[in-house]
Curated annotation (Swiss-Prot):
Annotated protein name in UniProt: Biotin synthase
Assembly and interaction partners: Homodimer.
Family statement: Belongs to the radical SAM superfamily. Biotin synthase family.
UniProt feature coiled coil, ranges: none
Database matches in Pfam families: BATS (PF06968), Radical_SAM (PF04055)
Organism: Buchnera aphidicola subsp. Baizongia pistaciae (strain Bp)
Molecular function terms from GO: 2 iron, 2 sulfur cluster binding; 4 iron, 4 sulfur cluster binding; biotin synthase activity; iron ion binding
Gene3D superfamilies: Aldolase class I (3.20.20.70)
EC number: 2.8.1.6
Alphabetical list of HAMAP family matching this protein: BioB
The gene coding this protein: bioB
Length: 344
């Protein structure tokens, strides 16, 4: 039976002592994953800039002066060259992003070819192309696309302060089409947009209460880019960021949690705490679309220090709800059993 989360349950989690939250998250993580293994993906911008949307965090919006170099859709040869390099570096998934509001019909055949050719390299494929209309999700799935990324970004109530060119329901509708098509969902959010705790809670509830939780959940720390409306936004507290990673793991125990944008500005200790809290995937490479990312040598050094091994093979996940007694422990705050991931 799938856990149905509500605000009170999640708020109670956030109210617990920091180390209690991490302890529970690590136990749940070990129940479902090899805690010393990390999945590597590579993200390539296949069409950059001139996006008509007004997402306040995004340097690719045509509405902001961010000095982003506008690039037209890459050729198949260019994409495959990057995919081959990604595989050589250890990535098991190749993600492709296009700065569109939605894919145009004229590009669908090319996208189909790209998917099929990348898969021939033995890589999983993921695309983020904006809102999907009509039968586009079905056609991408038929072409062999494994994952479709479409982030919710933040809570429904805060969303309108960040994006006005597409609605929250538009995003949810796209996720429904993706799930119905048979593709796996990659969907998460951005922390540090100026949201409150309640917004983080509502975002996690929205994700976890989808018909099936996303198989992949990217958690981003806002990268403040000069020229965007959020360039001077106050940074999220590091402990609040780590705590949110941990509670994401508790709420969605079998999903891969990707520590995504913002790692370039995180020290090794912060990243290590995120991995301890249940993050088990990263993007490999010096750039995420248009924002900086740690160089592979730096990541390799960190993995070596932490004893983390790169996951080379894809395995089927066990989506059963947890029932191990080790996930139950006593909260001194309430003098009663604090949490049972099976019965919540």
């Amino acid at each position: 039976m799938k856990t149905q989360w509500n605000f009170e349950k999640v708020k109670e989690l956030f109210d617990q002592p920091f180390f209690d939250i991490l302890f529970l998250a690590q136990n749940i993580h070990r129940k479902n994953f090899n805690a010393n293994q990390i999945q590597i993906s590579t993200l390539l911008s296949i069409k950059t800039g001139a996006c008509p949307e007004d997402c306040k965090y995004c340097p690719q919006s045509a509405r902001y002066k961010t000095n982003i170099k506008i690039e037209k859709l890459l050729t198949l040869k260019q994409i495959l060259k990057s995919a081959q390099q990604a595989k050589k570096l250890g990535s098991t998934r190749f993600c492709m992003g296009a700065a569109w509001k939605n894919p145009k019909e004229r590009d669908m055949h090319f996208l189909k070819t790209v998917i099929q050719e990348v898969k021939k390299l033995g890589l999983e494929t993921c695309m983020t192309l904006g809102t999907l209309h009509n039968d586009q999700a079905d056609r991408l799935a038929k072409a062999g696309l494994d994952f479709y990324n479409h982030n919710l970004d933040t809570s429904k109530s805060y969303y309108q302060k960040i994006v006005t060119t597409r609605t929250y329901q538009d995003r949810l509708n796209t996720l429904k089409k993706v799930r119905k098509s048979g593709m796996k969902i990659c969907s998460g959010g951005i922390l540090g947009l100026g949201e409150k705790l309640k917004d983080r809670i509502e975002l996690l509830i929205e994700l976890s209460n989808l018909e099936i939780a996303p198989e992949s959940i990217p958690i981003n720390m806002l990268v403040k880019v000069k020229g965007t409306p959020l360039e001077n936004q106050t940074s999220i507290d590091t402990f609040d960021f780590i705590k949110t990673i941990a509670i994401t793991r508790i709420m969605m125990p079998t999903s891969y949690i990707r520590l995504s944008a913002g790692r370039e500005n995180m020290n090794e200790q912060t990243q290590a705490m995120c991995f301890l809290s249940g993050a088990n995937s990263i993007f490999y490479g010096c750039k995420l679309l248009t924002t900086p990312n740690p160089k592979k040598e730096r990541d390799k050094q960190l993995f070596s220090k932490l004893g983390l091994n790169i996951k080379h093979k894809n395995t089927n996940l066990n989506y059963s709800i947890l029932s191990d007694n080790s996930l139950n422990y006593t909260s001194k705050i309430h003098s009663q059993q604090f949490y049972n991931a099976e019965t919540a």
